UniProtKB/Swiss-Prot annotation:
<dbReference type="InterPro" id="IPR000652">
    <property type="entry name" value="Triosephosphate_isomerase"/>
</dbReference>
<protein>
    <recommendedName>
        <fullName>Triosephosphate isomerase</fullName>
        <ecNumber>5.3.1.1</ecNumber>
    </recommendedName>
</protein>
<dbReference type="InterPro" id="IPR035990">
    <property type="entry name" value="TIM_sf"/>
</dbReference>
<dbReference type="GO" id="GO:0006096">
    <property type="term" value="P:glycolytic process"/>
</dbReference>
<comment type="subunit">
    <text>Homodimer.</text>
</comment>
<dbReference type="GO" id="GO:0046166">
    <property type="term" value="P:glyceraldehyde-3-phosphate biosynthetic process"/>
</dbReference>
<keyword id="KW-0413">Isomerase</keyword>
<dbReference type="GO" id="GO:0019563">
    <property type="term" value="P:glycerol catabolic process"/>
</dbReference>
<dbReference type="GO" id="GO:0005829">
    <property type="term" value="C:cytosol"/>
</dbReference>
<feature type="active site" description="Electrophile">
    <location>
        <position position="94"/>
    </location>
</feature>
<dbReference type="GO" id="GO:0006094">
    <property type="term" value="P:gluconeogenesis"/>
</dbReference>
<dbReference type="InterPro" id="IPR013785">
    <property type="entry name" value="Aldolase_TIM"/>
</dbReference>
<comment type="similarity">
    <text>Belongs to the triosephosphate isomerase family.</text>
</comment>
<feature type="binding site">
    <location>
        <position position="172"/>
    </location>
    <ligand>
        <name>substrate</name>
    </ligand>
</feature>
<keyword id="KW-0963">Cytoplasm</keyword>
<comment type="function">
    <text>Involved in the gluconeogenesis. Catalyzes stereospecifically the conversion of dihydroxyacetone phosphate (DHAP) to D-glyceraldehyde-3-phosphate (G3P).</text>
</comment>
<dbReference type="GO" id="GO:0004807">
    <property type="term" value="F:triose-phosphate isomerase activity"/>
</dbReference>
Amino acid sequence: MRRPLVVGNWKMNGRSASVARLLNDILAGIGDCKAEVGVCVPFVYIPQASEILKGTKVMLGAQNVADHNSGAFTGEISAGMLREFGCELAIVGHSERRLLYGESNELVASRYEQAIQGHLKPILCVGETLEQREQGRTLAVIGAQIDTVFEFAGVQSLEHAVIAYEPVWAVGTGRSATTGQAQEVHYHIRSLIARWNPEVAQAVQIIYGGSVKPENSAELFAMPDIDGGLIGGASLDARAFLSICHSVSV
C-alpha cells in the first residue's frame, strides 16, 4: 500500500521570520495527518528549517541538487552538503529549472543520480508544455524524461525516489489538469515503469503538481494512481497547506 505524500515547494519565497512562523504553524496543525509531509525551502533557510523540524514528522527538502558530489562547480550544492543539514528530499527537474535554466533530460538525470548516491530521496518532476499536449505528445515527452533517468540510475533507483507529474501549463497558472487528465498520465507513468519492473511500478509514489489547492486536492488525491501532491503557492499559506495535507484518503 502506497502511503500518500504531500510536499510543499516554497520556490524563491520567504524571509527568516516568515520561515519560522510558517514552519511552526504547519507543525502546530499537522496532528494525525495520514500523509507523509515534507517542505522544500530555499537553500539559505535549510539550516534554520532543520533546527525547527528536527524530531518532527515533517521532512526537510531542497529545491535542487548538484550533478557532482564536489569540486569546482561555483554556485552548486551537493547531496552530501544537504544531508549534513538534515535534508531528506530534493526536487530535481522542476519545470521552472527545465524551461528557465535550460536543464536537459541528461542534466536532470545526473542530478537525480547524485541525489540517490547521496542518500537523498529525489522528487523527479516530469511533464509536458501546452504546445506538446496540443500536439498529442504528452506521453512521449514524459516517457523520454523518465527513460533518460533509468539509463543513468536504473529503474531500481525508484525504490528510493518519488515521481511528480507537473503539467507545465498548470504550474503557477491557477489552471489545474482535470482529475481525469491527471489520472490518465499517472496511470501511463506507472505502466511505463511496469515495462521495466512491475513491482517497482506498484510501489513508487507518483504525486501531482500543478495549481493544487484545498478546493481540488481531495478529488485529485482520490484517483487510484495519484499518491499526493507537490504543492507550490498554496504551501506558503499554513492553513491552505494543512488543508491539502489532511485531504488525503488512505
